[in-house]
């Protein structure tokens, strides 16, 4: 019920992902709770927007996964006001089109606009042992075990926008 009636973008997004699959060979879905919309959303993530170590065989045991997120400044501002990201000034930098993205644009008949108002965020899913937030044993001593976090960094200025636990 939820996917077909509440998540209105699910079907068009899934269609886009399935259309893209033969072109790229791999595609991904990201399901998360959107604070601004107040509901769970499911988004298509192209393979070229996901960075993993070369020898990764699956995402569950991967030590780090980075999702490259292109976001409009207005959407970023909404997320900042909702408390998802730190309220800092992010000035977008006009990015170069990669060779892969250029070929995808050519195949799909798209032309990039001359003005790019988007900012680029790097959402890193990593295991960290942060001082003051360590895992502790029964005696209260740090164990040295790294805990899962999601760290979001602005690629445009290199500043950290958020660090939050990624509970498993």
Each PLM stretch: what is its role?
Residues 1-168:
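Extended alpha-helical, oligomerization-prone segments that build pores/tubes and scaffolds
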